[in-house]
């Protein structure tokens, strides 16, 4: 009987202010590794940068190699709701760094929450005036 590849789920939350990479087991119950952009850079303004996301992904891939996880399902998330539905600058860099680290990417999903007429957007009655 051949050995099954160990799979993990990488939840990448990429906003304009930070990038968080959180890897769990397939059920989502157990955290395997969690690194944010703020853990790898000194300046707060660099937390969301592609460089910080790349370094965070490298730290995550080291932890995954220790746990012998070879396959990854990636779920990319933006702030969503009534905020931005576009992932921040660190999302693509994190995915690229994870694939370069030798991990097999099974699939990439977009899981940004979409409002079904939820709460009111900020900006007042007439919206943001420029």
Swiss-Prot record:
<keyword id="KW-0699">rRNA-binding</keyword>
<dbReference type="GO" id="GO:0003735">
    <property type="term" value="F:structural constituent of ribosome"/>
</dbReference>
<dbReference type="GO" id="GO:0019843">
    <property type="term" value="F:rRNA binding"/>
</dbReference>
<comment type="subunit">
    <text>Part of the 30S ribosomal subunit.</text>
</comment>
<dbReference type="GO" id="GO:0005840">
    <property type="term" value="C:ribosome"/>
</dbReference>
<dbReference type="GO" id="GO:0006412">
    <property type="term" value="P:translation"/>
</dbReference>
<protein>
    <recommendedName>
        <fullName>Small ribosomal subunit protein uS11</fullName>
    </recommendedName>
</protein>
<dbReference type="InterPro" id="IPR019961">
    <property type="entry name" value="Ribosomal_uS11_archaeal"/>
</dbReference>
<dbReference type="GO" id="GO:1990904">
    <property type="term" value="C:ribonucleoprotein complex"/>
</dbReference>
<dbReference type="InterPro" id="IPR036967">
    <property type="entry name" value="Ribosomal_uS11_sf"/>
</dbReference>
<keyword id="KW-0687">Ribonucleoprotein</keyword>
<dbReference type="InterPro" id="IPR001971">
    <property type="entry name" value="Ribosomal_uS11"/>
</dbReference>
<dbReference type="InterPro" id="IPR018102">
    <property type="entry name" value="Ribosomal_uS11_CS"/>
</dbReference>
<keyword id="KW-0689">Ribosomal protein</keyword>
<dbReference type="Pfam" id="PF00411">
    <property type="entry name" value="Ribosomal_S11"/>
</dbReference>
<comment type="function">
    <text>Located on the platform of the 30S subunit.</text>
</comment>
<comment type="similarity">
    <text>Belongs to the universal ribosomal protein uS11 family.</text>
</comment>
<keyword id="KW-0694">RNA-binding</keyword>
């Amino acid at each position: 009987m051949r050995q099954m590849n160990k799979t993990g789920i990488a939840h990448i939350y990429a906003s304009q202010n930070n990038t968080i990479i959180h890897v769990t087991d397939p059920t989502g119950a157990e955290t395997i590794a969690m690194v944010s952009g703020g853990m790898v850079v000194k300046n707060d303004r660099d937390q969301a940068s592609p460089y910080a996301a790349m370094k965070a992904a490298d730290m995550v891939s080291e932890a995954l190699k220790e746990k012998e996880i070879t396959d990854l399902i990636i779920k990319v998330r933006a702030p969503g709701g009534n905020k931005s539905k576009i992932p921040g600058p660190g999302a693509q860099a994190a995915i690229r760094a994870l694939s370069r680290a030798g991990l097999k990417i099974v699939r990439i999903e977009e899981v940004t929450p979409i409002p079904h007429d939820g709460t009111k957007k900020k900006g007042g009655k007439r919206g943001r005036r420029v």
